[in-house]
Structure formats: structure tokens, C-alpha cells
From Swiss-Prot:
Phosphoserine carried by residues: 112
Membrane-topology descriptor: Peripheral membrane protein
Keywords, ordered alphabetically: Autophagy, Membrane, Peroxisome, Phosphoprotein, Protein transport, Transport, Vacuole
Organism: Komagataella phaffii (strain GS115 / ATCC 20864) (Yeast)
Protein name (record): Autophagy-related protein 30
Location within or outside the cell: Vacuole lumen; Preautophagosomal structure; Peroxisome membrane
Biased composition range(s): Polar residues: 45-63, 278-291
Sequence segments annotated as region (Disordered): 1-63, 266-291
Gene this protein is translated from: ATG30
Described purpose of this protein according to its UniProt entry: Acts as the peroxisome receptor for pexophagy. Required for both micropexophagy and macropexophagy, but not for the cytoplasm to vacuole transport (Cvt) or autophagy pathways. Required for functional micropexophagic apparatus (MIPA) and relocation of ATG11 to the peroxisome-sequestering arms of the vacuole.
Region forming the signal peptide: none
UniProt subunit comment: Interacts with ATG11, ATG17, ATG37, PEX3 and PEX14.
Keyword Membrane part of the UniProt annotation: yes
Coiled coil, from the record: none
Amino acid sequence: MFSRKQVQKRNNELSSLHCSNSSNSLNRIHKNEETAKGTVGVNARGNNRSDNVASPGQLRPRTSSILTDNSEWILFSPENAEGEYVITSSDGIRRTNSNHYYYNYNEDDILSSSRRSSEDVYDAEQEYTEQPVNNHVQVEDEEDDDSIINDLTHVVDDYDYEEEDDKQDLTTRIDNWRKKQVSELLNELNHDDDLDPVLNRDKIDLIQSWGIENEKLNTKPRAKKRQRKSKRASFYGQDLLSKYSMEDLKIIKQIVAQLRDDLDKVKHDKPSSPLPNYHNTLKQAPSSNSQNPSFISYYSNYLTKNNSQQTPNSQSTSGSLLNNPNLEKYLPLFLKNLLYEDSNGSHQHPETSEKEHFWDNDLKSVNSSILTLSSNSKLKQEIL
């Protein structure tokens, strides 16, 4: 058994050792706070503390200097009967608390103030981050409200119930759309010069079936169109050919092709005598044994066949040729003079001076007309 003095001595040694360890940590806290406050004399107190701190592994002997008024050490007494520690400080203030060690300064106030300041900073940051969004949303809501009010004010002032009823009527809307489409189509028809007449007529009939007034149709300036076409004559005889129908032009095409072949044959022949008189050639009857009939025989047979369908009582080829009402229609002027024959069947030829120069002058004009018609005529492309 240990004596009471030994136990007390042991407790004093333990308390001194524990006090030295605790004082080191509390001195560090105290030094940091003094640095923050800008107090003077930190180095001096630090020197005093370094003098009083024992080296590790050594027990600092108890001296009376620990309990002096200038000392900053905190001494812990052994546990009392009530289970509390008596905390002694240099300023003479004693505090008791179970299971805690307190320093002279009011650390609760410091920690609570720092905690409150951190909470205030956090709350301020939250308010700063949330406030712009809310303000933006609030501004947008206010602007939307203002725009809606302005729009509604305009609608209420200019509201027309009859017009609204008409818009709601589906039949009226369809009719308005149809009229708009028809007006655009009419505008296109009136400004399209290259439109097919048959297609144009079909479109106009379709528009009339929709109940459109006739005053809106056929408003195209026809006179100007004809005038423009008349200025575009690009080949010889265009004004004459424009009077023929498509069927007549097909017949003329066949006749011109046969005439070209016959003229080429006569041109490339090498007769022993001078160039024959074309009028005398007309007097000669076509040979029935000839394999290649001449243009005169071909055209006479064609007109005979055509005239027999129109006048069944015709008696002779020459009479049908001369009395055919289509003679002036199908034969150009220079050919009609060559094939002219009176009603008695006798051949009458015009002035000799004109016929002598036929092969030199008129044949060139015929070839020129044929070549122009075959190459540059848009009308020939329609015939083909």
C-alpha cells in the first residue's frame, strides 16, 4: 500500500506533466490570436514560454515561478471528490467544467462569432446567387404582362365581331382562297405569249366553270401580240405561209420536196441542146412508161384526186388543175404563172423575156426559200 504522501506526490508529478503538454497547445492558440490582433510583446512572451517549457522526456521541476502573477501557465489539479477539475489561470479566474479544459479567453465567444460570421457569409452568397435569377424571372414576367395588356388593349379597341364571324366561316375562307388562286392564274395567262391556244382555252373554260366573271378573261392585248409577231419575220414568204393551216402546210411540204428532187434532176442533166423552154416542157404529155414521174404529173395527179373528192363531176386532168379553187392556195405565184392554162385547154405562156431567165434567177430564189424554210423556220419544226 502506498502512503498518502506518495500518492499525492505522484499526482502532483502527473499533473505537472499534463500541465506542460496542455500549455504548449494553448500557447499556440494564444500566439495565433495575438498575431491576429496585432498586439505587442509577442516575442517576449514567447521567450518566457520557451524558457518554461521542458525538453521532451524530462519532467520539469515544480517551482514557485509557475504560480506567479506574470505566468501564463494553466495548472490542472487532480480530480476532486465531485469529479470536476479546478482550472487556474494567471489572472486569478477559476472555472470548473466537467471533462473540458478552458483557456483564459472566452473561446466560446470567438468560435460562436466566427461560426456566425461564416453562416452570414454563406447566407449572403445564397442570396446573391438566387437574387439575379429571381429578378430576371420577375422582369420577364412583368414584360410579358405588359405586352399582353398592350395586345389585348389593341384587340379590344379594334375588335370586329362580323369580321371574326366571316373568318370562322370555312366556306368563305375557301372561296377567298379560290379567288386568289384564279386571279394569279389569270395574271399568268394574260402575260404568257408562248402559251398553247388549246391549253389556254382549256384553262379559260375551267376558270369559267368556277363561276368567274367573263370580264376578267381575255384581257390580253391581242393587237400588240400580232404586231410583235409581224416584226419577227425571218424568212421569205412567211407572211404567205402564216395564212395556211397545219394540214395545208403538210401538203405544201410534200410538194416542195418533190419539186426539189425534180429541179435537182433537171439541173444536173447535161442536154445536148441549150436549156429547154419550161413552157414547151409543160406541153409535152407525161409518159406513162416513165419510172420517175415529174413534178407536174405528180402534182396534177394529187390535185385531180383532191378535186375528185370535192367535185366528182370533173372530166379532165387539165380542167381539174385549172378549175381547182385550191390552186392559188397551194401554188406560189412564180409556179402558178408557169402552169397557167386557159379554160379551152390551150397553153398560154406569159412574156418570153420572163421565162427565159427562170432557170437563172427564179430557180435561185426557189432554192433560197426552200433552204430558209428547212433550216431557220420555226414553222417547219411545227410541221415536222
